[in-house]
Regions:
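A short hydrophobic beta-strand element
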Residues: 112-122
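Short, low-complexity N-terminal intrinsically disordered segments enriched in polar/charged residues
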Residues: 17-50, 54
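A solvent-exposed, acidic/Ser-Thr-rich amphipathic alpha-helical stretch
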Residues: 50-114
Length: 167
């Protein structure tokens, strides 16, 4: 009886660990597909449509942390998608390249929660000039879609470099 009980407990623990990992893997694949679609959008100059809205929940929020906003700035889904399209309209190209992905944890329980953390390197290009920068994101999911992204990057440095290139 003890042996059966211990086997059941061990199997339950193993199943719950795999279940968390499965959520992470599924969400990670979803996020990687989004990055691929964003990169493709910028690579092909004739591609005008950006069909990435379905990657996000309707109440998606992008949180950024520029200088002067220690609690961050919230950007809703519509404005976030418009800002990506606006970059292309300004002849700015973006490529998200080098990335390191890690599973995220719940901020209260410290247990794996299916979220994705990513350290990335990106390049913004205008004509033949490039601006390279790094950033960090935490990405939360709800029912397989991106609910929120928190991003930390050197926005001031990127902005200064863009101003120099656009003179």
């Amino acid at each position: 009886m003890k042996k059966i009980l211990l086997t059941f407990i061990f199997a339950s623990i193993l199943f719950s660990c795999n279940n968390d990992n499965y959520g992470y893997e599924k969400n990670l694949d979803h996020f990687k597909s989004l990055i691929k679609d964003i990169n493709t959008y910028f690579i092909y100059s004739k591609q005008d449509s950006l069909a990435i809205s379905n990657y996000y929940t309707e109440d998606f929020i992008f949180y950024s942390f520029p200088v002067g906003h220690k609690k961050g700035v919230e950007t809703n889904k519509s404005d976030y998608l418009k800002s990506i399209k606006q970059m292309k309209q300004m002849n700015i190209s973006m490529n998200i390249g080098h990335s390191i992905y890690l599973p995220g944890i719940d901020k209260d329980s410290y247990k794996l929660d299916g979220s994705v953390r990513v350290y990335y390197g990106a390049t913004l290009s205008i004509d033949t000039s490039n601006i390279e920068f790094s950033g960090y994101q935490t990405v939360d999911f709800s029912d397989g879609k991106i609910l929120a992204i928190w991003e930390w990057a050197d926005y001031g440095g990127v902005s200064n470099q863009l101003k120099k290139l656009m003179k």
